[in-house]
Design a protein with these regions (language model features):
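Short alpha-helical interface elements
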Residues: 50, 63, 81, 112-115, ...
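Output/docking surface of receiver
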Residues: 18-20, 43, 66-134, 151, ...
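Two-component/phosphorelay signaling modules centered on CheY-like receiver
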Residues: 1-17, 133-174
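Conserved phosphotransfer microenvironments
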Residues: 2, 11-13, 18-65, 69-80, ...
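Hydrophobic, Leu/Ile/Phe/Ala-enriched alpha-helical segments that form helix-helix packing faces
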Residues: 56, 107, 111, 142-150, ...
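Generic structural signal for beta-strand residues in well-ordered domains
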Residues: 9, 30-31, 58, 83, ...
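Short, solvent-exposed linear motifs at loop/edge-of-secondary-structure regions
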Residues: 14-34, 117-146
C-alpha cells in the first residue's frame, strides 16, 4: 500500500491496525481514538460480521464499514440472506493493494464532496454499477488514471502551495450502486460532473 501511495505521488498513507476477532475489534474501537474506517474480511463461516457492522453503525453512524470478500456463488447466496444495511460498500478483494488505496480515496472523496464539488466547484465523475465484482475492478483503474494524470500536472514548475491546491482540485469519484443513489448524486452534482460511467444494461433495467 505504501508503494502504491509513493507511485501515485500521494502523501500520508493510512495506518492499519489488524485484529482477528469481532471482540478484538469492539475493544479497539472503545480504546483507540482516531479510527476512520473499519474494513472486515468475510468468508462463509463468519457469523459475527453483520452484527458487528450493526453495532458499529448504531454507536458511530458516520464511521465507514467496508466488507472485503472473495466472491463466489456461495458467498453471493449467503450475503443475500443477511441484513447488509449497516455495510457501506462491499468489495471483491484478491489481495490487490490498489483496491485498498481506491477504497480509501473513495471515502475521502465522499466525505469532501459537499465542500469541494458544491462549494469550490471541483469536477466529479459518477460511476454507476451494481456489480460488486465489476466496480471492484473499475475503481482502482479509474483512480490510477486520474492520480497519474494529476502527478503529470505536478511536474510543472509549481511551488508547494500550488501543488497542494492542484492535488486537492483533482476530479472526485462518486460511486452509486443503485438507481436511486445514482439519480440523487446526479441531481446534486450535475453542474460539476465530467461524466457518468455506467453499464447500459443496468440503466435499461432500472429505467424499465
Amino acid at each position: 500500500i505504501y508503494r502504491e501511495y509513493t507511485d501515485l505521488n500521494l502523501s500520508n498513507p493510512p495506518k492499519f491496525i489488524w485484529v482477528q476477532t469481532a471482540a478484538q475489534a469492539r475493544e479497539l474501537l472503545n480504546t483507540v481514538v482516531g479510527i476512520d474506517m473499519v474494513m472486515c474480511m468475510y468468508n462463509v463461516s463468519d457469523k459475527e460480521v453483520f452484527s458487528l457492522a450493526t453495532e458499529i453503525k448504531n454507536d458511530r453512524p458516520n464511521l465507514p464499514f467496508v466488507l472485503l470478500t472473495h466472491f463466489s456463488k456461495e458467498v453471493y447466496r449467503r450475503l443475500a440472506l443477511q441484513d447488509t444495511s449497516a455495510i457501506d460498500y462491499m468489495f471483491c478483494w484478491h489481495g490487490n493493494a490498489d483496491l485498498i488505496v481506491a477504497i480509501v480515496k473513495l471515502f475521502e472523496d465522499l466525505q469532501n464532496a459537499e465542500h469541494d464539488i458544491s462549494g469550490v466547484g471541483v469536477q466529479a465523475i459518477l460511476l454507476v454499477e451494481d456489480s460488486v465484482r465489476y466496480y471492484s475492478t473499475y475503481l482502482p483503474e479509474l483512480y490510477k488514471l486520474i492520480l497519474m494524470q494529476t502527478r503529470e500536472f505536478l511536474t510543472e514548475t509549481l511551488n508547494q502551495q500550488q501543488r497542494k491546491i492542484r492535488k486537492r482540485s483533482r476530479p472526485k469519484i462518486l460511486l452509486a450502486t443503485n438507481y436511486d443513489d445514482a439519480l440523487s448524486m446526479y441531481e446534486k452534482y450535475k453542474n460539476n460532473l465530467l461524466g457518468v460511467i455506467s453499464d447500459v444494461g443496468f440503466c435499461e433495467h432500472r429505467g424499465g
